[in-house]
């Protein structure tokens, strides 16, 4: 498509033909309204396409525009409904990359629908030929639109009341191997981990209902393990039973069975399952008093490339609106991608009620969550006891620290592995509360605790040389 302007006066009384997008959709004098949905796009225009035209094209193709003028434009008020590119900034130290700020009127979006929101913002425009690459970096949801969403089924405060645990991060573990265990052996591993001191165990995201372990069998053996561990420890325990399924009807059937077994929490793969399924399940969880753990499988397909796709902070905001009580966020110190400033930026967007604009952490807009419940951050992936001081310092209390291999890989077995993590956690929390420097004294804190815990001493020896030192790709 050429960007030269062509116009023909039609008999219908409008200018037919193709004209530059910037004539209609680039409005640098526009001041966004409090009710506008705002978006920050990282654009890489094709050679010869000015950034103003590229930004206007994004605004047009994600709102009311198409490639040519149409006579039906005369039947509505385009000035009321169109998206507007109101600012463009060059990206520092990047060639031919720009941040385009676009404002969308609220009437373009269905109330309470993340599906409709994303269909516009990250729809066909991402295949637009005028752009070599396009990435949605951040969005600002106005309070007027935020109030149309239920948000998390319960939120952080209600979850703590449900499980009666306060003043520390929660401890979890993904059962390994992730695939291949029978339901009975799976339940045995759950029991050993929970009796050893963990608060939660977890289905891997891959576990649904495969030939080696059908979902109903898994639910039954896990329920037996949880009730037995609770009776022995006097603590409330949980296991994230993955109810993700091929249909919403099957998903809800599995959720109902978990409720019948008196399970406190279930799990959903929200990206592969889809936002319609996730919002449906979130509403069910609130109505039925069940917590909802969210896994982000497939997120890196969408968010890992720096110049194309959608940043995880956008997915985080959408998940909080759609609903979930926990979500995986990366660890900063483990095996998965995540730079500290960027990671804690979207962790704050998940947990806090009001987050100020902070470009150093990738936060392009101030976000008011209008008292919506918070989502607990889950740090999971390649972490072990030596990481505990850093994890406690980085993530704080409102988090779940999830040690899979770091529990089940203990030489003495699952229960000692869980005990090692629980001792390490409580030692670090006590040291933090006493005002000790976790960054400088973390190793000493663990070694002191290990004098009274042979399980921790063995774990410290096994994983003393394990590090994951790669440069993070997700940077400002």
Swiss-Prot record:
GO biological process annotation, one example: photorespiration
Subcellular location, principal: other
Record keywords, A-Z: Bacterial microcompartment, Calvin cycle, Carbon dioxide fixation, Carboxysome, Disulfide bond, Lyase, Magnesium, Metal-binding, Monooxygenase, Oxidoreductase, Photorespiration, Photosynthesis
Record localization: Carboxysome
GO molecular function, one term: magnesium ion binding
Keyword rRNA-binding: no
Modified how: The disulfide bond which can form in the large chain dimeric partners within the hexadecamer appears to be associated with oxidative stress and protein turnover.
Miscellaneous information on this protein: The basic functional RuBisCO is composed of a large chain homodimer in a 'head-to-tail' conformation. In form I RuBisCO this homodimer is arranged in a barrel-like tetramer with the small subunits forming a tetrameric 'cap' on each end of the 'barrel'.
Name used for this protein in its record: Ribulose bisphosphate carboxylase large chain
